[in-house]
């Protein structure tokens, strides 16, 4: 499990120091989440959803096009050993489904369409052995990721 968590966090990048002002970092840490990235325009944290699933939430700060960011994040995750399965969307966000056959885990990359706070885009990666295929399952993944991200905005 530790190897899976480490792999997910490494996919997200390097750690720096200067969180965006509208993110409640104290509450994130108080709730037992792990800060992954802390920069002036990107902040990310990770948490265990259950014994076999990890959620990493990232806030991108700035005036970015959500659809372009969605494709950009998806393409960044497509490395050797990761297969693109498909994508979908709901009113709340976009989701890209990827699979790592060697590890037997799925990655669901979620990007919120709407911003609770202007110029704060919520994205998330859910890593799980569970395959979610139905529209209602994918909508639940999108909702989980966005709700978790919005919970820590001031």
Language model segments and positions:
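Short, solvent-exposed coil/turn segments at beta-strand boundaries
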Residues: 29-31, 48-52, 90-93, 112-121
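Signature of long, low-cysteine stretches enriched in small and polar/charged residues
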Residues: 78-117
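Short, exposed beta-strand-loop hairpins at the edges of beta-sheets
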Residues: 99-101, 112-119, 125-137
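Cleaved targeting-peptide boundary
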Residues: 18-26
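Short secondary-structure junctions
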Residues: 29-39, 76-89
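Secretory pathway targeting signatures of secreted, lumenal, and periplasmic proteins
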Residues: 26-68
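Surface-exposed amphipathic alpha-helical segments
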Residues: 26-34, 124-154
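Sec-dependent N-terminal signal peptides
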Residues: 4-14
């Amino acid at each position: 499990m530790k190897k899976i968590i480490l792999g997910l966090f490494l996919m997200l990048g390097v750690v720096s120091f200067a969180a965006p002002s509208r993110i409640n970092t104290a509450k994130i840490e108080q709730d037992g989440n792990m800060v992954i990235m802390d920069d002036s325009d990107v902040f990310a944290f990770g948490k265990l959803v259950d014994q076999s699933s990890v959620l990493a939430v990232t806030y991108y700060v700035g005036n970015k096009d959500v659809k372009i960011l969605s494709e950009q994040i998806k393409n960044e995750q497509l490395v050797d050993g990761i297969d693109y399965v498909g994508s979908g969307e709901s009113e709340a966000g976009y989701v890209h489904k990827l699979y790592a056959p060697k590890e037997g885990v799925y990655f669901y990359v979620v990007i919120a369409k709407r911003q609770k706070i202007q110029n704060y885009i919520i994205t998330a990666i859910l890593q799980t052995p569970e395959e979610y295929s139905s529209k209602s399952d994918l909508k639940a993944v999108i909702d989980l990721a966005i709700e978790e991200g919005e919970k820590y905005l001031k």
